[in-house]
Amino acid sequence: MNHLAEAEYRFACLVWDNEPLPSGQLVKLSAAELGWKKSTTYTVLKKLCERGILQNEGGTVTSLVKKEEVQCAESAA
């Protein structure tokens, strides 16, 4: 089971609910839903891509792991 911090989980939910998602649209969604700046969005996206949760291919963000396979660390505690 993959564990995500609450903010990471909320970010991943944006992808799961809207994928496939152009990265520019993800930046706008993150700003509207999470109050994040562009740099924050790309930092978290990179982190989740490195962990094999999401992928960003050709500017399109999709998930590699289903929502059901991920647990929010806060709900696991």
Feature roles, as predicted:
Residues 8-15:
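Hydrophobic residues on short alpha-helical segments
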Residues 20-21, 54:
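Conserved hydrophobic residue
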Residues 21-30:
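Short acidic, hydrophobic short linear motifs in intrinsically disordered regions
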Residues 43-49:
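Basic amphipathic alpha-helical segments that dock to polyanions
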Residues 49-59:
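A short, conserved structural fragment
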